[in-house]
Amino acid sequence: MKQKRLLRRDGFTFKQFFVGHDRCAMKVGTDGVLLGAWTPVSDKKAILDIGCGSGLIALMLAQRTDENTKIDAVELDTEAALQAQDNAEQSPWQRKIDVYQQDIGDFAEQYSQCYDLIVSNPPYFEPAVACRNEAREQARYTGSMTHQQLLQYAETLITADGLFCVVLPYAIGEEFETMACHQGWFSHHRVNIRDRQGKPLHRMLLAFSRKEKTGLISELTIRQPDGAYTQEFQQLVTDFYLYY
């Protein structure tokens, strides 16, 4: 009988790499995994991860792209950036990933490179009652970077043919899509996601382009009514999750 190996508790073990997240405010979660597994990467050679946290999405994209692809990962929080750097250095793709501990606005002003793929799992709570943990507040609340600012930074840093991909809660994703269209973006692909069959839509994956085109809309369900992962979700994460 095949036995499951003993896994580390300070992070998340994938098939080809480990993501430590004990020094990060936001832990490895389904949102980041969805974005990292779904984002279109064909022919992408220069990738930017805005607000990379532990480096999860950057690492997933490194696994999915060829050795000539370069990935820049920008993170404001010092401890999270250090952990993302450690995770990259301990992965098979150390040479592909550079981590910058920097505000994305400062990064956009300092570097002239443009990217053919930009990804972000952005904060989505509006500032209200202050969080007791400053790092967690940065990761979860839009006070340090609004969605309008994120769209503006992406516009500055993307190539003419590039894609900008995000994951957001469903209702906030609808607002984000409307805002993006008002700022001159075009919806390239939208995936409406429900956590379980029969439940309301819960998340949204979005891919935008600066070029006009007819957008594709599809749907993904993560779990069956009995809680087991659906076949479509297993197929999406099969290169990453253990035991699939």
Curated annotation (Swiss-Prot):
Q: Which PROSITE patterns match?
A: N6_MTASE (PS00092)
Entry's Pfam families? Answer: MTS (PF05175)
Subcellular location(s) per record: Cytoplasm
Q: What is its main location?
A: cytoplasm
Record field: catalytic activity: adenosine(37) in tRNA1(Val) + S-adenosyl-L-methionine = N(6)-methyladenosine(37) in tRNA1(Val) + S-adenosyl-L-homocysteine + H(+)
Specify the domain of life of the species encoding this protein.
Bacteria
Known EC number: 2.1.1.223
User: Per the UniProt entry, what is one GO biological process?
Assistant: tRNA processing
Q: What GO terms are given for molecular function? A: nucleic acid binding; tRNA (adenine-N6)-methyltransferase activity
| InterPro entries, A to Z | DNA_methylase_N6_adenine_CS, SAM-dependent_MTases_sf, Small_mtfrase_dom, tRNA_Adenine-N(6)_MTase, tRNA_adenine-N6_MeTrfase
Q: Which protein family is named in the record?
A: Belongs to the methyltransferase superfamily. tRNA (adenine-N(6)-)-methyltransferase family.
Function, as annotated, reads: Specifically methylates the adenine in position 37 of tRNA(1)(Val) (anticodon cmo5UAC).
Q: What is this protein called?
A: tRNA1(Val) (adenine(37)-N6)-methyltransferase
Which organism does this record belong to? Photorhabdus laumondii subsp. laumondii (strain DSM 15139 / CIP 105565 / TT01)
